[in-house]
Design a protein with these regions (language model features):
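Non-catalytic C-terminal interaction segments of nucleic acid-processing enzymes
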Residues: 1-10, 14-17, 153-176
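Short, charged/polar micro-motifs that form catalytic or ligand-binding hotspots
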Residues: 5, 20, 35
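Nucleic-acid-binding surface
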Residues: 10, 14-21, 26, 54-129
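A short acidic, leucine-rich amphipathic alpha-helix
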Residues: 26-35
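Short amphipathic alpha-helical interaction segments
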Residues: 36-51
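Catalytic cores of nucleic-acid endonucleases
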Residues: 115-171
Length: 176
């Protein structure tokens, strides 16, 4: 099912839900995710969220967040990287929710369940510790901006993938 179809007429709720889970994303990412909206409709939604105190914009206008604190918590890069992976997978998403650490978000597709996990250096110990706790049927998508980071991850026998993200989105997905 196309994400645009699933989100139609519920864009405000989807944006609030996504911002609550991720904390902070780039404005261009959110615009790309909701590219089915006209510029006017999208602008009206953001203006409404800002007016109601549900969205905050960084001073340079690059980031969209749930609060000023979200911009300062130091995990902006992790959130942005994982959001690129969510955008890549959007048309496979049937439902999504916040996940238990080390994952940021879990989503279901028609065939499988997925965890989107930031592969930052600080998160590697938690990823390795959780490898035996997470069910084998769940696909772990470990999002990194440098392939060498994946060398530190202890992969499970099945269903572990590395997602390489660049400044403009997902560049490649690797089976681990």
């Amino acid at each position: 099912m196309k994400f645009a179809y699933a989100a139609r007429d519920r864009e405000v709720a989807f944006i609030i839900r996504l911002l609550t889970i991720f904390g902070v994303v780039e404005q261009r990412q959110m615009r790309l995710l909701f590219d089915h909206l006209s510029n006017r409709s999208y602008g009206q939604i953001l203006a409404r969220l800002r007016r109601e105190g549900l969205a905050f914009f960084s001073p340079d206008g690059q980031f969209l967040a749930t609060s000023r604190y979200s911009l300062d918590h130091g995990k902006t890069l992790e959130s942005v990287m994982v959001f690129w992976a969510f955008i890549k997978m959007r048309d496979n998403v049937l439902d999504f929710c916040a996940s238990d650490p080390p994952a940021i978000l879990s989503f279901s597709s028609a065939a499988k369940d997925y965890d989107l996990i930031s592969g930052s250096k600080q998160n590697i110990p938690a990823i390795n510790a959780a490898r035996t706790v997470v069910a084998e049927a769940i696909v772990r998508l470990i999002v990194v901006d440098d392939l060498s980071t994946l060398d530190e991850v202890e992969p499970r026998l099945v269903n572990d993938y590395g997602v390489l993200v660049g400044p403009n989105g997902v560049e490649r997905i690797y089976k681990m």
